[in-house]
């Protein structure tokens, strides 16, 4: 990785599809955590609670009210950079989605999914 | 040999899946009002959808990105969300229009209450989707849509003055707002974006790779060119039969009338059958398109081939869209009116979904050697300009003409 | 400023379609009669299918019902509108044409599978269309 890489990676990283090691689609990169100087990507942030901060300032308050408060570990997840295996058209993770808490909405354990007629 | 057959099947599916209720409504009315004068607009729209479809298919095959994946990446979350909300609203209207159209066609075939057929049609579509594999759905409705070829036969049977018909392909504008409204309507009806969003997601479901690029190009060029012929036939037969006697085809049944005039009951049944498959297929495509877009934008698991157990949110949202469409149709709004609004609003939303694809298709860092060449890039940008103009004038024209009501 | 202009344009666009309300003008009457002629033409085509046994009865019936409803709606619209005195006579003639048309469609609806009736309705539809067309000529011919 050369020094230009972080900026390029941020451009190719934000909003990308995330796949786990089984190729399961389990969310998108809703935000990125940067730390240090020069800044380095230290984690991917994923979850509905992060949507409001992606909107124009004026709409954020309303969006927060709809999305609900940020609860780390449930509607906002931190995926450490070490979990990232490979980046091409999508971000591939080393582990399984369930182990990282990702893709809960499509998880058979989800209360909504459990109530669907075909489950 | 097998490869040729496969390509032929793909082309046929594209051809049969090209027409939907928007084309039936706008092209027949355009013919009745302006005889062959708007054929050029059909051609303009057909080339446009072929350009867009070819790019989306190529991006999907090379980068494995469906349309709303590209949109979220290129536009970011905020602007992308605008594109998503607009597309979803248009898709919902489209599903309602197609479902209502399907129910009207069924009442013409089996005289019973309209609302009963709305519900039966929705249930029928769910059953078809539940039982058939992805390719099967596309093929059954695509092949069934080939019955629409009867309109080409009707055109030849009527044997219009082909010189006049050819003259209709020369673009002409007039200061009449109604004429301009129909120019926008006819182009927009051919350019309905859900078809492309559906087929590019379908390409990923069917595991397209760079090897599929030739198939993609043939589907787009040959399939849509042949589809365009069907769309032109609708204008020609209506222009020949309805224009001289001043018929205003305000409902779907009238669309099939020229086929009855030419070939009697057989012609009528072929026409109604073809319309049924076209509109039914479009109901499936547009509802799937709505669910694909939502799931892709939010990063959910998606795909008809993943099945409801592996992609529960995707499947559930598809059913919700279908259900909402049923409610819209049952509210009593005339499906033909819903169609007009769906088509006009679709072109208003189109630039936002077209631009990201155009940018990615031309970006070598994503597409490598398959990026837009000079011709594709030129065509792509020319059509972007066309779409932007249409998007700007569409709503003022809709208001000024009272949705074509004069 | 831009917003005010936009609002004015929007208001104008919204008001434009309603600008013609009030008395039934010669122009509006003309348009009404033209649409009656168009309905009659369509009725003639459907009836000819019935007469030649070249259609499906359900199709003819449902179409006759839909188009008949439109004819009736047109008749009511013409009958309810206040017409200016100069076109009073034409207005009454138009109402009569619309009424006849609605009757013909209801006959077609009842006898959608009957070739004999189909031929009769076809013939009458043609006559009604001629009446409507003559009325259009009168309305537009006398216009200043």
Each language-model region and where it sits:
Chain C
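Sec-dependent bacterial lipoprotein signal peptides
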Residues: 1-21
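Short, solvent-exposed mixed-charge patches
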Residues: 142-144
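Amphipathic, charged alpha-helical scaffolds that flank and support histidine-based chemistry
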Residues: 108-122
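Alpha-helical segments in soluble extracytoplasmic regions
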Residues: 28-106, 121-138
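C-terminal region of N-terminal signal peptides and the immediate post-cleavage residues
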Residues: 16-33
């Amino acid at each position: 990785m050369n020094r230009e890489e972080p900026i390029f990676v941020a451009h190719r990283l934000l909003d990308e599809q995330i796949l786990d090691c089984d190729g399961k689609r389990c969310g998108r990169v809703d935000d990125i955590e940067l730390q240090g100087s020069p800044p380095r990507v230290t984690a991917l942030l994923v979850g509905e609670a992060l949507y409001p901060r992606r909107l124009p300032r004026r709409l954020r308050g309303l969006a927060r009210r709809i999305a609900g408060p940020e609860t780390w570990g449930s509607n906002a997840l931190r995926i450490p950079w070490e979990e990232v295996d490979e980046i091409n058209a999508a971000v591939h993770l080393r582990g399984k989605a369930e182990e990282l808490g990702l893709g809960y909405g499509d998880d058979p354990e989800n209360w909504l999914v459990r109530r669907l007629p075909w489950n | 040999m097998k490869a040729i057959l496969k390509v032929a099947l793909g082309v046929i599916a594209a051809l049969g899946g090209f027409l939907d209720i928007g084309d039936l409504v706008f092209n027949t009315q355009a013919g009745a009002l302006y005889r062959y004068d708007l054929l050029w607009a059909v051609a303009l729209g057909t080339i446009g959808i072929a350009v867009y479809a070819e790019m989306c298919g190529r991006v999907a095959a090379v980068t494995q990105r469906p349309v709303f994946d590209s949109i979220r990446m290129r536009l970011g979350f905020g602007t992308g969300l605008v594109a998503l909300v607009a597309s979803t609203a248009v898709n919902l209207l489209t599903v309602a229009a197609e479902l209502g159209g399907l129910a009207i066609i069924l009442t013409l075939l089996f005289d019973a209450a309209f609302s009963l057929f709305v519900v039966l049609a929705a249930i029928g579509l769910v059953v078809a989707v539940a039982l058939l594999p992805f390719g099967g759905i596309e093929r059954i409705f695509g092949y069934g849509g080939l019955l629409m070829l009867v309109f080409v036969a009707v055109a030849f049977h009527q044997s219009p003055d082909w010189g006049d018909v050819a003259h209709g392909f020369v673009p002409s504008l007039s200061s009449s707002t109604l004429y301009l409204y129909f120019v926008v309507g006819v182009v927009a009806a051919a350019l309905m974006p859900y078809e492309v969003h559906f087929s590019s997601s379908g390409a990923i479901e069917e595991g397209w790779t760079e090897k599929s690029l030739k198939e993609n190009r043939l589907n787009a060029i040959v399939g849509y060119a042949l589809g365009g012929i069907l769309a032109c036939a609708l204008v020609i037969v209506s222009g020949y039969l309805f224009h001289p006697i001043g018929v205003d085809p305000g409902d779907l049944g009238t669309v099939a009338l020229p086929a009855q005039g030419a070939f009697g009951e057989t012609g009528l049944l072929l026409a109604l059958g073809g319309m049924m498959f076209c509109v039914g297929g479009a109901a499936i495509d547009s509802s799937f398109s709505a669910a694909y877009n939502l799931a892709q934008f939010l990063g959910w698991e998606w795909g008809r081939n993943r099945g409801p157990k592996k992609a529960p949110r995707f499947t559930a949202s598809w059913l919700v869209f279908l259900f909402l469409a049923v409610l819209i149709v049952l509210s009593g709004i005339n499906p033909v009116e819903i169609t007009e609004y769906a088509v006009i609003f679709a072109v208003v939303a189109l630039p936002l979904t077209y631009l990201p694809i155009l940018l990615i298709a031309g970006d070598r860092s994503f597409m490598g050697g398959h990026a837009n060449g000079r011709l594709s890039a030129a065509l792509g940008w020319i059509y972007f300009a066309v779409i932007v103009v249409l998007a700007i004038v569409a709503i003022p024209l809709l208001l000024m003409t009272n949705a074509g009501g004069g | 400023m831009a917003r005010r202009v936009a609002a004015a344009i929007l208001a104008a666009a919204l008001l434009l379609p309603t600008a013609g309300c009030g008395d039934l003008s010669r122009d509006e009457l003309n348009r009404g009669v033209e649409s009656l002629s168009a309905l009659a033409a369509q009725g003639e085509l459907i009836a000819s299918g019935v007469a030649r046994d070249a259609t499906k009865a359900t199709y003819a019936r449902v179409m006759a019902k839909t188009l008949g409803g439109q004819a009736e709606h047109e008749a009511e619209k013409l009958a309810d509108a206040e017409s200016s005195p100069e076109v009073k006579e034409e207005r009454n003639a138009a109402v009569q044409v619309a009424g006849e048309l609605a009757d013909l469609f209801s006959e077609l609806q009842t006898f959608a599978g009957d070739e004999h009736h189909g031929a009769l309705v076809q013939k009458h539809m043609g006559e009604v269309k001629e009446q409507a067309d003559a009325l259009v000529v009168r309305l537009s011919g006398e216009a200043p």
